[in-house]
Amino acid sequence: MDAFSDILSGVKLIGAVFFAAEFSAPWGFTMPSSCVMTARLAPGASHVVLYHLLIEGRSVVEMLSGEQIGLEPGDIVVFPHGDAHHMSSGKGASLPFPNYGISDKVKSRDLSPLHAGGGGEIARFVCGYMTCDPHLCGPILNGLPAVFKVNIRTDRAGHWLENSILHLVEEAASGRVGSAAMLAKLSEALFIDTLRRYVSGLSAEQTGWLAGTRDPVVGKGLALLHSRAAHPWTNADLAEEVGISRSALVERFTRYLDEAPMTYLTRWRLQLAARALQKTSRGVADIAAEIGYESEAAFNRAFKREFGQPPGRYRAEHKSLLTNRRNKADD
């Protein structure tokens, strides 16, 4: 399995479409940051990635920094770090935007399209989100900008995803049994497909973890480290399996990931340990051995360096945090 798939398969992604609209120009609204949206959409989540998929018409996304991104039909715009932003018809739309009752629609989970605006050109779109653990998704999230867009209408797979999501949004709005669960799975597929399209569009000069997965040397090295994380790797062993000199391997990893292979392996092992501490009741010594540590004490020291606290406290605080979030969600 490649490293990209390995991370995504090991992280519990939960997706949903939370809003559908048919606005007429001029129109505009402000989407708060994920800190605010998490409480509204997924109170038990530790991180929310937001996205908008434009179905018809034109739109402009403006970040609080002033950066503007024009959207065409089929464009999906993603906010990996949950940055606040404005979305509007562009020309003729100005702050402060009217109150269209979006918050009420989101709160009620009503997916029937909201109709609003000034009577001009029509824009149809849906808004969705993905939840994930930022520690376990770190390699992917850290390699993404504050905002990016791709167009999913460039092939049949993208058309199928778009049409399927629109069909299920209509079904969910009418209350058909099972439509919400199917929509959640499709939202996850759309997110992964969008990431793949983003990676395939990176320039040859681009660095970072995502770009590294495309490089024949770094990509193969990452796949080996992920598939055999507990193996007692050395730079020389990994270089031999990849088919390159040790010095060239280290240089290539450092160029793309800004760290040497064994440094990356250590962090990946500790992320696997964090996942096990969160999701299982296995003992710390067993987890340490499973990821390649012969000494529990050495594992404890490494874990504290990475996460700022020993494994036992990390597990206890994670459980407490989940309990508090669930209690708030029930209030």
Question: Where is each model-derived feature located?
Answer:
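Generic protein-terminus/edge-of-domain signal
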Residues: 1-69, 75, 86-114
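A short, N-terminal "cap"/entry segment at the start of jelly-roll beta-barrel domains
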Residues: 1-30, 124, 138-156, 324-330
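Short helix-to-turn junction characteristic of helix-turn-helix DNA-binding domains
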Residues: 54, 225-228, 277
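Residue-level recognition of short, solvent-exposed, well-ordered loop/turn junctions
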Residues: 72-73, 80
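Alpha-helix-centered segments that form part of catalytic cores
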Residues: 109-136
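An amphipathic alpha-helical interaction segment
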Residues: 126-223
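Basic/polar phosphate-binding segments, predominantly the helix-turn-helix DNA-binding elements
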Residues: 189, 193-199, 220, 224-271, ...
